[in-house]
Amino acid sequence: MTELKNDRYLRALLRQPVDVTPVWMMRQAGRYLPEYKVTRAQAGDFMSLCKNAELACEVTLQPLRRYPLDAAILFSDILTVPDAMGLGLYFEAGEGPRFTSPVTCKADVDKLPIPDPEDELGYVMNAVRTIRRELKGEVPLIGFSGSPWTLATYMVEGGSSKAFTVIKKMMYADPQALHALLDKLAKSVTLYLNAQIKAGAQAVMIFDTWGGVLTGRDYQQFSLYYMHKIVDGLLRENDGRRVPVTLFTKGGGQWLEAMAETGCDALGLDWTTDIADARRRVGNKVALQGNMDPSMLYAPPARIEEEVATILAGFGHGEGHVFNLGHGIHQDVPPEHAGVFVEAVHRLSEQYHR
């Protein structure tokens, strides 16, 4: 078992005592850092960066060299799984991700393979192993996947969407086809996350970026049900240590109670949910991660510190809080402001852990 020098992130997820509130940032390895842009240019394009274990490791470690973060997160993309299913992922300038062969019907679903994580997704596992080696036990490594619903939105829409009419048409006109797709994705994601854990990920997170576009009933049936299946199938212990699982549904603040029933260890909150309210509702069951508005990092340092203080006070004394943004950091945020944020979390949270 690798001895971790700093395990406060894992301890907080398990609601165990910590000295200060741990902090990391969604998309902490990314375009707001000048050094990331240099490595990205070296790789040529985004997927080449993901598929090169050494370069993926380099960008994973870059934010840790700048800031005293309490966790590293694997540099990858949620669309690696659909890509490995053969949908032909490519990136359109200004348009984001696209697929050459979107899923349109049950026959398309039946043809999709369940990818072997050590074969078609072997490059991700190589990156995990490389990052773990290079971290030298400094902080834990987080692995992740998109949720079945969120992955399905890209696969059926053929890329990003604003209104989600194509997948909602399938959901209401041909629910069987969508359930078949979600079931296949749940199996694929379970294998994928378990392979990341075996390769060295010490915690995992499921990103349900688009769960919030659903009605409550549809969220239960088409998103949460399949995340629950994944949580049930995950390795919860590895290398003599519990492997915590965090679920994050953007726009899912009204469903925290149902999410907490899945058996996950923590829930990610976006910035539209009040953390004090969330703790009252589910804090006796799960840890909470979040939840500063990423746009707050455009504010002057004093305002960033004030917001950090407000969120810490909202959560209050005791254990079970991992500080983060409510979604990914924006690409044009000044890197110094991210530094102010991280430093403020550690300095201002000490009083809540005495």
From Swiss-Prot:
Q: According to the UniProt record, what class of enzyme is this?
A: lyase
- In chain numbering, the residues marked as site (Transition state stabilizer) are D77
Keyword Lyase included in the entry's annotation: yes
- Give the GO biological process terms: protoporphyrinogen IX biosynthetic process from glutamate
* Keywords associated with the record: Cytoplasm, Decarboxylase, Lyase, Porphyrin biosynthesis
Q: Name one GO molecular function term.
A: uroporphyrinogen decarboxylase activity
Q: Which domain of life is it from?
A: Bacteria
What Pfam families would the database entry show? URO-D
**Keyword Heme set for record:** no
Q: Which residues bind substrate?
A: R27, Q28, A29, G30, R31, D77, Y154, T209, H327
Q: Which reaction does it catalyse?
A: uroporphyrinogen III + 4 H(+) = coproporphyrinogen III + 4 CO2
Give, as in the UniProt entry, the pathway in which the protein acts. Answer: Porphyrin-containing compound metabolism; protoporphyrin-IX biosynthesis; coproporphyrinogen-III from 5-aminolevulinate: step 4/4
The cellular component terms of Gene Ontology attached to this UniProt record, alphabetical and capped at eight, are: cytosol
Entry similarity comment: Belongs to the uroporphyrinogen decarboxylase family.
- Do you know which NCBIfam families this protein is assigned to? hemE (TIGR01464)
The protein's role, per its UniProt record: Catalyzes the decarboxylation of four acetate groups of uroporphyrinogen-III to yield coproporphyrinogen-III.
Provide the assembly information.
Homodimer.
**Protein name (record):** Uroporphyrinogen decarboxylase
**Organism field:** Shigella boydii serotype 4 (strain Sb227)
The gene name on file is hemE
